[in-house]
Amino acid sequence: MKMKQISDTTLKITISLEDLMDRGMEIADFLVPQEKTEEFFYAILDELEMPDSFLDTGMLSFRVTPKPDKVDVFVTKSKIDQNLDFEDLSDLPDMEELAQMSPDEFIKTLEKSIADKTKDDIEAIQSLEQVEAKEEEQEQAEQEAESKKEPYIYYILSFAKLADLVAFAKTVTFEMETSELYKMNERYYLTILVDIENHPSPYPAWLLARMREFADDSDISRSVLQEYGQVLMSHDAVLNLQKIG
């Protein structure tokens, strides 16, 4: 379970299904407002240590968005009082004016006063809906980017001397699918294909930094090497170079 402050008036709390079960809750509990749900909301706010700006601010509005593996709860500060009191409706006429009103005029005046009082609350809800829509778009974009991520990366390294190439090959201990060796314009080029699918996202950059300790990263693509370079080893180049000397 984690909390993120989106703005001065809005918090986003993400609750996993496991967290829900640990607290005796399930998604169906959020479909119909009930005392159990409200108690749960305030309990998790206490547990997550709500920011000071949200303390003692009166009523809070909760908006729940169920997901397949979690529940997102958006919490917004509300300016409306939980119990509306006629004394709070300062725009209402005094008793003498009220006595002269028809029932229709009284109802319209009362509705206007309540509408003015709840305007801030309505705006907060509308703002919350906009925040939720942006969060949805961001999550969808991240999921699409993740799905498009290639599971393999070709690293292409450049060496001025064959001895440097052999020395580098002997330092390689990471797993690779295959490797190739080309020669072009009096330089040696080593391509290394690595499966990154089951590695953390920083792994490709970490691996490249490690390679750069012994070799130069190249701007030349594999397709250029295939077309214009001389193929010295078409597969398992690193393994074969490790056998030298």
Curated annotation (Swiss-Prot):
HAMAP family: MecA
Pfam assignment, any one: MecA
InterPro entries: MecA_C_sf (IPR038471), Neg-reg_MecA (IPR008681)
Function, as annotated: Enables the recognition and targeting of unfolded and aggregated proteins to the ClpC protease or to other proteins involved in proteolysis.
Subunit structure: Homodimer.
Name the UniProt record assigns to this protein: Adapter protein MecA
Source organism (scientific name): Streptococcus pneumoniae serotype 2 (strain D39 / NCTC 7466)
Xref: PANTHER family: ADAPTER PROTEIN MECA (PTHR39161), ADAPTER PROTEIN MECA 1 (PTHR39161:SF1)
Comment field on protein domains: The N-terminal domain probably binds unfolded/aggregated proteins; the C-terminal domain interacts with ClpC.
A GO MF term: protein-macromolecule adaptor activity
Similarity comment: family membership: Belongs to the MecA family.
